[in-house]
């Protein structure tokens, strides 16, 4: 297992229902998990419990030695909006040549004139693409993706899907995008009132 929770509970003051209620969860290499549930059930909080940004109230969280987590936030907080796309990647991966960086950006649909533009002047979709590319270029083995297809057009979604299909680590994603979940996941975790119910297969299998 990359990460394991035993008897994990989490509740915020002022909320009637817990985020987790005495749950046993594990994520292993090859797992591709889609987290679904109603608004306010705590799907993003569950991602933060996996990263350790939020801490469980009781139970245990064990991260395997050598586990490295990459986290895609909806607000693109990993980006420096003053820098252009090439510089963002250069800082992350100084081992990559300019040609390799341009090829990676080209795969994520960055045209020549876009790669030199500071991110502050790019659209939400363009920022999303660079944030996703950066996470895929990191040396991680567990990817957490919070609504990764928001702001993406169909071409960009297909590019992301191809990249995630090639990715060798585990993936956990919160998404309302049924098409994306059908392409990517092999498990659905339904979060409701602190209980995680696991279904094997993709989103279409889950709703059957």
Where does each model-flagged region fall?
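ABC ATP-binding cassette signature C-motif
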Residues: 1-208
């Amino acid at each position: 297992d990359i990460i394991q929770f035993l008897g994990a509970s989490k509740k915020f003051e002022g909320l009637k229902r817990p985020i987790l209620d005495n749950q046993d969860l594990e994520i292993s290499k090859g797992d591709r998990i889609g987290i679904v549930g109603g608004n306010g059930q705590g799907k993003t909080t569950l991602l933060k419990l996996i990263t350790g940004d939020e801490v469980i109230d009781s139970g245990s969280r064990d991260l395997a030695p050598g586990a490295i987590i990459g986290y895609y936030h909806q607000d693109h907080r990993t980006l420096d909006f003053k820098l252009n796309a090439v510089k963002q990647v250069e800082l992350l991966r100084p081992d990559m040549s300019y040609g390799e960086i341009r090829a990676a950006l080209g795969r994520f649909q960055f045209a020549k004139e876009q790669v030199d533009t500071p991110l502050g002047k790019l659209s939400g979709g363009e920022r999303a693409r660079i944030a996703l590319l950066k996470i895929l270029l990191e040396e991680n083995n567990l990817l957490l993706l919070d609504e990764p297809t928001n702001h993406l057009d169909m071409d960009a979604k297909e590019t992301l899907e191809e990249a995630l299909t090639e990715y060798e680590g585990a993936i956990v994603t919160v998404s309302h995008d049924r098409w994306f979940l059908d392409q990517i996941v092999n498990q659905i975790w339904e979060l409701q009132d602190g209980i995680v119910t696991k279904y094997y297969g993709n989103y279409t299998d889950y709703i059957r």
